[in-house]
Amino acid sequence: TETTTASESTTETTTTQQEETQSVGEYKAFWFSFYDYDSYRAKYKKRTAANFRTYFTGVVKKGKSLGMNRVIVQVRPFGDAIYKSKYFPWSKYISGKQGRNPGFDPLKIMVEVAHDNDMKIEAWVNPYRVTTGSTNYKKLAKNNQARKWHAKKSTRRNVLSYGGSLY
């Protein structure tokens, strides 16, 4: 039988942990937020899958040139979605108006572009924020859950108004 001392065991464990950390690499991320979707919409008057792919590819390549290895994309900014969802309307930040289909799948494109550039991608979700600076439910898409809840007295409390915003 072979015996291992506590010192040898600790050394082996530490070496294994260091090797695992080195193989995973450092976490160097940047955030692609709803402001970046606004920048895309400002740059391209014709909003197509090809234009979005071009825009996001430029963003990813810039991040890569700065040593980043991961992009965190905001996919649920204001009670809406940057992907097709049966629960949340399309985000105004991708299409210009909440509830309007942009005609392509932005999240699919972002995943493809990130992976094509050897970059990891993570989704960022704001689960509670519905609006900032407005409590006007009529500005929300008709299929926005907050608007639906507000329409019924029994569920109105599901959405809170605080500081001129909805949550």
Give the residues covered by each predicted segment:
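Compositionally biased, intrinsically disordered low-complexity segments enriched
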Residues: 19-20, 76
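Active-site-adjacent "subsite" loops/lids of carbohydrate-active enzymes
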Residues: 22-54, 123, 128-167
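Soluble non-cytosolic domains of exported or imported proteins
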Residues: 46-54, 66, 97, 101-105
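Short, well-ordered coil/turn segments that N-cap beta-strands
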Residues: 24-28, 67-69, 115-121
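Aromatic-lined substrate-binding rim segments of carbohydrate-active enzymes
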Residues: 59, 76-126
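Extracellular mucin-like PTS domains
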Residues: 2-18
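Catalytic domains of carbohydrate-active enzymes, especially glycoside hydrolases
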Residues: 54-80
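Short, solvent-exposed beta-strand-terminating loops
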Residues: 70-82, 128-139
